[in-house]
Amino acid sequence: RENVIDYSLLEFCLREDLNKTAPRVMAVLDPVKVVITNYPAGKEEWLDAENNQEDESAGFRKVPFSRELYIEREDFLEEAPAKFFRLSLGKEVRLKNAYIIKGESVVIDANGNITEIHVSYDEDSRSGSGSEASQRKVSGTLHWVSIAHAVEAEVRLYDRLFIDEAPDSHKEKNF
């Protein structure tokens, strides 16, 4: 009997299993530098981050936070449309397990590329603090890494192996 299972079912099953067992870390694949202008130079904090949101028994890990961070380049637009739920100038977002930041200005190189984003942070908005500022609603939450503590890593991004949903249905092609 021939059987073709939808790829999205496999992805769903993998996600379900990994959500229960995989340790969480933050990585930035296409970094842009963020400078928190009102955060003291030389200061660093070790913030608590859940090891697994779906398993309280997994505990917490410490994540370093400092004045200079990396975020994903795609998480920032200088002039963002209304439905952009990430960082832009004049807009607030939360840094995961950290603080609320607001885009203030950018540094652009000779080729027109953004090389730095300058932001301010709300010192009272630390995640989990229970303060009124920490419970403020913002448009999105971004993952990040502290530049001073970043390590290089090899990342393998996998996608679908075949373009066709049912590659074996083409008898003239050799798969």
Model-derived regions, located:
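Basic, alpha-helical terminal appendages of large translation-related enzymes
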Residues: 1-175
